[in-house]
């Protein structure tokens, strides 16, 4: 549990006649101060000459700290374990006193392959973490394969700069589980239905293109000619009216998209989809060369009856931006998500292509700001990544599926920055040739 520094009583010796804080005289071992804030101590001598000294207390790595306790080990992705949650927000974020919570594992390869485990927590009541919109459920991404810790954060930033209706937010925090430091985690919002998340209202659907071996036993899905589509929300049963409604609508959209007059503005795919959402989803995943987004998984879309099908939210980029060694997605050159069946067909429509070029030009114009953000996040993690590596010792060794191995965090970040620049330069030229 964190020691309180909001009312800390310092001891000191001075060479002078008086010491004050904000004009108030101070006595050693007597006057409490709030050291979550920067303080200015002024020392004066008998002649009235004074000097001021800034006190800036930095706790641990400077990141907020989350303390989780569990009644038993977290060994399952399916079953919650009872526990507690406490957030020490330090000076940057609102702290949250200890409250009841439930904790379970999450993820697929990230859960089964790596020792640093990702978690999902469910608070006893809705709370805002790090200024994000309040909710009960929060994800703790371990970012074990991504030694920069920044790829998901970078993708989320691209999403926030796009026309996508909602993109998850996340913030870094040190995490202690049962008083054992488990390193830095990326605490994020979950892709789920909710007023403050994917707002599909009472009648909408949140869907995910997925794979049979990734489904849970109670998942309900349907298959188009091209994809297996998992109905994430709402809860439906096979054959009921809601199941039939969404299956028939998505199937009809795909039939029209792959049909003869697919680009007709009134009767083709434009009548069915929010085109800008498809374009921005495509561009973000293509810039990242996100290995799973071509056809495999974490491809989300949502639809409210009476409206158009929208792509998104974006999700799962720890193996993006070249961080994969088993596919051409390793390299910053070459198309990848462009070969997604739906996107590939839309790129046969000249109007779609022109809009893609316009949207990419807007994104590329923001590249200096994006790179500045990336450098700022890396600086924010300057102390934290060192503590994280002290625990997990991933620097300088291969972690699945890293295509390159560097000895230092700075080299890992530089590689990501260089890869991003090369990728965006390549896409700028390649789009002109479409």
Regions found by a protein language model. Name each.
Residues 1-63:
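Beta-rich interaction/scaffold domains
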Residues 22-23, 88, 178-179:
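Short strand-turn-strand beta-turns centered on an Asx-Gly dipeptide
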Residues 118-122, 138-142, 149, 157, ...:
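Structural recognition of the beta-strand scaffold that forms the well-ordered cores
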